[in-house]
C-alpha cells in the first residue's frame, strides 16, 4: 500500500482553532436563547434595572423645564400680568377721575338749578306783590271814583227830592187852602195853611 502524505502542521492548527471558535459561538447563542426563554419580559419604565437612568433623565428634564420656565415663560407671564395690572390701575384711575368730574358736574348743575329756582321764586314773589299793589291801587282808585259818583248821585237825588218836595208843598198848600175854603166858606190865611202843610210834611218824613 502506498502511504498518504500528512497535511502541513500550520494548516491543521488553523482549522482546529476555527472549529473551536464556531463551536463556542454556537454554544453561546444557544445559551442566550435559553436564557431569553427562561426570563420574563418587563415594561421599560417599570424595569428596576433602568430606574437610575430614568431618575437621572427625570431630574435633567425637570431642570431644563425649570430653567426654560424661569428664564423665558415666567418673565413673559410676569410682564403680561404687570402690564395688565398697570392697565387695570390706569382704567380705575380714569374711572375715578370721570366719576369725580361727573359728581362735580352734578353738584354744579344742582347748585345752578337751586339758584334758578330761588330766582324764579323771587321773580314770582315780586310779580305777585306788584300785581297786588297795582290791584290795590286800582281798587282804591275805583272806590274813590265810585265814591265821587255816589256823592254826585246822592247830591242829584237830594236836589231832585228837594225840588220835588217844593212842588209837592206848593200843591199841598194850594189843595189845603181850597179844601179849607170850601169847608168853612171863607178863605184862610195863606201863612196858616203853609205852616200846617209844613208840620204835616215834617211828621211824614219823621215817620
Curated annotation (Swiss-Prot):
PANTHER family cross-referenced by the UniProt entry: ATP SYNTHASE SUBUNIT B, ATP SYNTHASE SUBUNIT B', CHLOROPLASTIC
Subcellular localization(s) per the UniProt record: Cell inner membrane
One Gene Ontology term, aspect cellular component: proton-transporting ATP synthase complex
UniProt name for this protein: ATP synthase subunit b 2
Gene3D superfamilies, per database record: 6.10.250.1580
Membership in a protein family: Belongs to the ATPase B chain family.
Gene Ontology MF annotations: proton-transporting ATP synthase activity, rotational mechanism; proton-transporting ATPase activity, rotational mechanism
